[in-house]
Each structure stands twice: as structure tokens, then as C-alpha cells.
Design a protein with these regions (language model features):
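Active-site neighborhoods and metal-handling regions in enzymes and metal-associated proteins
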Residues: 19-443
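Sec-dependent N-terminal signal peptides
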Residues: 4-14
Length: 443
């Protein structure tokens, strides 16, 4: 098969920095890349995951506009939703044999799943599904039901009940939750995805560099909401999507203290940007079915200032150190809760006032995989935090530290978030990370 990802492979050789916007594919080109990646994932990744989790048959059932989140990631680029009732069956006949991909539908699902419903032989769709199950006689039939992971709980009550009603009793003991398989499918990035993910993160960084600059921000005139909507409009102009509404907030030398609850549960108030403000932005895009989630800081230079005040940069460096502390704790099979505890213990030993709330990222912004803290659950997250780390999962390294700023007479928080991936070679940032506070204007 022609490798449609080659144009991306040469981009790192061009000497891009975070200020350069990579070329963005048109819709037809995107569709070709999406389908190439999807075919590769199903043919090469899915069999490995099914064997790892011990499920030899995976059944997914969804109706149009009410799709299972997992099924939605398996639809080809030209399918924007399921059709009527779509049934997907993946069957692993064993080592050395090719994965069987079956659609119990009137038509094939693109080139990926062959339609196998002979309406003359089986007028009822459910009967056709049961025939496939009886013919393959699997040891375990995985269905997407999960108490802890919403993304792995996509089999709705109506379809679940209908399935069990028609399934012969002898197969009922073989029904198992496909939670681990669903999470593995969603969280694991393929080699092809890891080839393009750095460029997707680069696009997000480049948009931030453009929007939080003297081009857009004029102290005393521009509001935080102006910047937010500039970001939304710019994403739209580029033909991209955003999976959440951005935020831009301000910390400055005034009596107002940092409101932890407001920061995480409410949108910041609209404020005019002034000289000497420390701006924080939270922003993410969706492109080629992958998401980004980035938080960075920008300082608006006062007239005559040439650089960021040292005390602010020192505060920033503490959060950078916390990033390192956290990612140094990543280890295969270690749970998110253990990673969280070890990182917070190390941060405390170094005198950092730290908070960690890191999450996987990929097909979804807050994606499947181990949760490493929530902003309001620093003691661990039951269920999602107990899930172990595997290789080739991408993470948004999201956290903050608190620091006293003597000249401001107050405590500030430096909240950072950058996307990276944990592989057998360790953790690395997909497009680097912010290493110092950016100035407005740039120097």
C-alpha cells in the first residue's frame, strides 16, 4: 500500500519551531490518511490487543446517531455515523491466522469489514449475528460494558437486552466485559499515528504563538474573551476542530487571590489585558482523529521591560520540574494512582506545592487509559486510576505548582499542560514543551 504519511515524515527535517504552522491537508487527503491508519490499526494492532486481553470475539452493536464510542473510531472516513443498526464482529481464530472482520449489515463498512448479512437466509439481523457466533464458537464474547470507563460502556441498554434475549443460553457464560480490550484499542497509538502526532501538536503550538502575540494582543484594548474567540475562529479558518472551548485567564499584581474552584469548575471572567499581566491559555485541537491539549503562559512586557521578571520565571521552573518528576515515575504496568502518589511524594520532598491531574489523550481529549489524579482527587482515583500504564499511550501532562511572588504580595499558580507519549524507550514530548514564559511582544 502506498504510504500516504510520507509528507509528514519530512516535516521535522525542515527545522520547524513552535511558531511555524505545518501544512494542513484538505478533506480528501485527510480521508486517505485516516483510512490508511485505521486499516493498519485493525489489521496489525487489534489482533495483538485481543490476544493480550484473552478475548477471541468482540461484538459491537450501535444504531445510527447513538454510536458506541469505540465503534465510532472504527468507522471509515466516509462514514460519519453508523447506519441503521450496525453490528461489528471481530474474531481471532488463533495464532498465525488472519483476524476475521465481519459486519452484520446490508453493506460492507468501507474496505474494512465485509458485509455478511444474507437477508434471504436470515431475514432478521439478530438471527444473522447469532449464526456467526454459533459458526465461530468463541471462547469469550467481549461486549462493551464498563462501570469505570464511559468510553468502554458503549453497548446501550436496549441493544444489550436484545442481544441477550436472542443469544442461545449456552453462550451466556462466555459473555465478558471487553473493558480492557476497548481501553487498549483507544489508548494505544500505532507507529503510523506516532509519525503524524508531533505535527498535530505543532499545529496547536503554532496557533497559540500566533494568537498570544503582539499581532492579536494590545494592552488596555484586547480582552481575554477576544483572544478566546480569535483562537476559535483561527481553528475554523484552518478547517480544524476544537474539542473544548479555550480559556484565557490572567494573574497580575492585584489583591485577588487564585480561586482554585473557579479555575477548574467555571470559566474565567472576561478581563482587559494590561501591561505586566501573566496570561494562561488552555487550548486543544482535533485533526486526523487525534486531539491535543495544551496550556502555556505568556507575559505582557511593561514599557521598558526586556524580559520576564525573574520571580515569575522561577515559579515557572518549579512546574517544569514537576513535569520531570511525574514522567520519571512512568513505568510499565504501574497504575495511575501509584504514579500519582510517587510523584507527589517526590515533589513534596523537593519543597514543591504541587497538584497533578494528568490524563491520556488520543481519539478523545480526556481519553481512555490510566487517570493520574484529578484536580479535586489528589489521593488517587478509584477505578480509572487503578488502570496500569502500557507502552504507546499518549498523555497530556497536566499539573501546577504554587509559588509566592514577593513583588506582587500573593501566591500564583503555574498551570502547564503538554502532550507526550510513553513508549518502550521512555517518555517524550510530541512537539517539545514550553521551557520559559513567552513574552508579548516577542524578542
Amino acid at each position: 500500500m502506498q504510504n500516504l504519511l510520507l509528507p509528514f515524515l519530512f516535516l521535522p527535517l525542515l527545522g520547524f519551531t513552535q511558531t511555524n504552522l505545518p501544512g494542513i491537508l484538505n478533506i480528501q487527503e485527510r480521508a486517505a490518511v485516516i483510512d490508511e491508519i485505521l486499516e493498519d490499526r485493525i489489521d496489525n494492532l487489534l489482533p495483538v490487543l485481543m490476544r493480550r486481553t484473552g478475548i477471541d470475539m468482540w461484538v459491537m452493536i450501535s444504531r445510527e446517531y447513538n454510536e458506541d464510542p469505540v465503534m465510532k473510531t472504527m468507522l471509515p472516513s466516509t462514514w460519519l455515523s453508523a447506519r441503521r443498526r450496525t453490528m461489528m464482529v471481530f474474531y481471532d481464530p488463533g495464532e498465525g491466522k488472519e483476524l476475521e472482520k465481519i459486519a452484520i449489515a446490508r453493506y460492507s463498512v468501507g474496505r474494512l469489514l465485509e458485509g455478511s448479512w444474507d437477508i434471504n437466509a436470515y431475514p432478521d439481523q439478530w438471527e444473522a449475528l447469532i449464526n456467526v457466533i454459533a459458526e465461530k464458537n468463541p471462547n469469550q464474547i467481549g461486549i462493551n460494558v464498563s462501570e469505570n470507563f464511559a468510553l468502554a460502556d458503549g453497548l446501550v441498554k436496549t441493544e444489550h437486552e436484545a442481544f441477550l434475549k436472542v443469544l442461545p443460553e449456552k453462550f451466556h457464560p462466555r459473555i465478558v466485559s471487553a473493558e480492557k480490550l476497548a481501553i487498549s484499542w483507544l489508548e494505544t497509538r500505532s507507529e503510523k499515528e506516532l509519525e503524524i502526532y508531533p505535527m498535530i501538536c505543532r499545529i496547536g503550538h503554532a496557533i497559540l504563538q500566533e494568537g498570544l502575540s503582539e499581532k492579536m494582543i494590545h494592552p488596555g484594548i484586547t480582552t481575554t474573551d477576544d483572544v478566546v474567540w480569535w483562537l476559535r475562529n483561527r481553528v475554523n479558518e484552518l478547517g480544524l476542530d476544537t474539542w473544548f472551548h479555550p480559556t484565557v485567564s490572567i494573574q497580575r499584581a492585584d489583591p485577588e487571590s487564585f480561586d482554585h474552584l473557579r479555575t477548574f469548575s467555571k470559566r474565567p471572567d472576561t478581563r482587559y489585558i494590561q501591561f505586566g499581566d501573566l496570561l494562561h491559555v488552555d487550548f486543544g485541537i482535533t485533526y486526523l482523529r487525534l486531539n491535543t491539549d495544551q496550556q502555556q503562559h505568556f507575559y505582557v512586557l511593561k514599557p521598558g521591560e526586556k524580559e520576564v521578571p525573574q520571580e515569575l520565571q522561577v515559579a515557572f521552573n518549579k512546574s517544569s520540574r514537576l513535569q520531570d518528576i511525574l514522567t520519571e515515575q512512568f513505568a510499565l504496568s504501574r497504575s495511575g494512582n501509584i504514579v500519582l502518589k510517587r510523584a507527589l511524594d517526590q515533589a513534596k520532598s523537593e519543597g514543591l506545592i504541587a497538584s497533578i491531574y494528568t490524563h491520556p489523550i488520543g481519539f478523545h481529549g480526556h481519553a481512555a487509559g490510566p487517570t493520574i489524579g484529578l484536580w479535586d482527587q489528589q489521593g488517587g482515583v478509584p477505578g480509572r486510576g487503578d488502570y496500569p500504564l502500557y507502552h504507546n499511550t499518549a498523555y497530556s501532562i497536566e499539573l501546577n505548582t504554587s509559588s509566592e511572588i514577593p513583588s506582587w504580595g500573593k501566591v500564583i499558580r503555574i498551570m502547564l499542560e503538554e502532550d507526550g507519549v510513553y513508549t518502550k524507550d521512555g517518555f517524550w514530548y510530541l512537539d517539545g514543551r514550553q521551557e520559559e514564559i513567552f513574552t508579548i511582544p516577542r524578542h
